[in-house]
Amino acid sequence: MRSYERSKAAYEEAVTLMPGGVNSPVRAFKSVGMTPIFMARGQGAKIYDIDGNEYIDYVLSWGPLILGHADPQVVEALKRVAEQGTSFGAPTLLENELAKLVIERVPSVEIVRMVNSGTEATMSALRLARGYTKRNKIIKFEGSYHGHGDSLLIKAGSGVATLGLPDSPGVPQSVAQHTITVPYNDLDSVRYAFERFGEDIAAVIVEPVAGNMGVVPPVPGFLEGLRDVTKQYGALLIFDEVMTGFRVDYHCAQGYYGVEPDLTCLGKVIGGGLPVGAYGGKAEIMEQVAPSGPVYQAGTLSGNPLAMTAGYETLRQLTPETYKEFRRKAARLEEGLHQAAEKYEIPHTINRAGSMIGFFFTNEPVINYETAKTSDLELFAAYYREMANEGIFLPPSQFEGLFLSTAHSDEDIEYTIAAAERVFARLRG
């Protein structure tokens, strides 16, 4: 058993300083029954906690670190740029360079606006969609997280296409009533919502691969159907690619699945581990954003040199071959975990999209939030604790996916599979 004494002491202090001792709720490790593990450093695919324990990391700061920790080229570029100034509140050439890479690689993006987080990106995209269409309502999908903007913190009602109720205190009902929540991968529900409210629906916002109910890819025809119905009713289609952007494919999920939205939200990978977000799309729509148009959005640190540098240096190193390697390694990890679980009769379903993997403790196919919730959460928590003791750092939530980086070696994958087999044996012992 590993010692976490220093992490425990650090957490005892942290709870006196921050709500719940953390700056983002899932980091509290509540769903897995552990004290949060405090990290000290990372290198490549490995991270090290303040007690000196080493882990193979499949969290990667919740996705951004596609090159692994402390990539030498990213670090060197950040040092060079930081010495020249960390922020100016004025344009820099670095913004141009990252914007050009994004526009070159994301099929639907003709113009892009940089912001500071994924939440800013989705909030801004929704404001733009409402301003452009002059409509109020949006459709989102049950179990999909698009940041903590008021319009998006909504849970589904009990019926199909039910108007949302606030999912957090502090979200006014007057805001929630404009959000329609339907099941993911359920095109009929979307069509029904449009039949009822179509003239007032500004946009559908969707993760092309759902990443906050585990990893749930779209069923065949789902994204294409969303594209068709939004065009039919004059609404915008927004892809939230904060998680999938440059993770699923060189051209993002929209390139992989061959469906182009009107607006795209990005984050995570395009900041290389620094705070960043972006939203972009067709020029006709994006030109409505101030100062070109009347839809206002601004940010003190938007496009800051450090985030632009980390993002540029990260994207510059990614090639189409990178994603072939990701698919090979992810397929091997999926296969190995499946074989280990089968051997010990562990109920499981594994979903995969690019370098994202979702492991669910259920035999039911996981295609939406309801089926994701059939996973055995107690078994997941036990699995999580045992894997941590084996030196595998996983997301401390059943409803988050695993991420691979270019730094993960074949040896890392094989060790992870062997560790899972040992854990499954103990869980069934």
Swiss-Prot record:
The protein's required cofactors: pyridoxal 5'-phosphate
Family annotation (Gene3D superfamilies): Aspartate Aminotransferase, domain 1, Type I PLP-dependent aspartate aminotransferase-like (Major domain)
N6-(pyridoxal phosphate)lysine modified-residue sites: 268
Listed GO MF terms: glutamate-1-semialdehyde 2,1-aminomutase activity; pyridoxal phosphate binding; transaminase activity
One Pfam family recorded for the sequence: Aminotran_3
CDD domains attached to this UniProt entry: OAT_like
GO biological processes: protoporphyrinogen IX biosynthetic process
SUPFAM superfamilies: PLP-dependent transferases
Pathway(s) the chain acts in: Porphyrin-containing compound metabolism; protoporphyrin-IX biosynthesis; 5-aminolevulinate from L-glutamyl-tRNA(Glu): step 2/2
The EC number(s) this enzyme carries: 5.4.3.8
Enzymatic reactions: (S)-4-amino-5-oxopentanoate = 5-aminolevulinate
Keyword tags: Cytoplasm, Isomerase, Porphyrin biosynthesis, Pyridoxal phosphate
GO CC annotation terms, alphabetical: cytoplasm
EC class of the enzyme, as a word: isomerase
Record flagged with keyword Cytoplasm: yes
Localization per Swiss-Prot or TrEMBL: Cytoplasm
Record keyword tRNA processing present: no
Family per similarity comment: Belongs to the class-III pyridoxal-phosphate-dependent aminotransferase family. HemL subfamily.
Subunit annotation: Homodimer.
UniProt cross-references to PANTHER family, sorted A to Z: GLUTAMATE-1-SEMIALDEHYDE 2,1-AMINOMUTASE (PTHR43713), GLUTAMATE-1-SEMIALDEHYDE 2,1-AMINOMUTASE 1, CHLOROPLASTIC-RELATED (PTHR43713:SF3)
Name of this chain's protein: Glutamate-1-semialdehyde 2,1-aminomutase 2
Organism: Geobacillus thermodenitrificans (strain NG80-2)
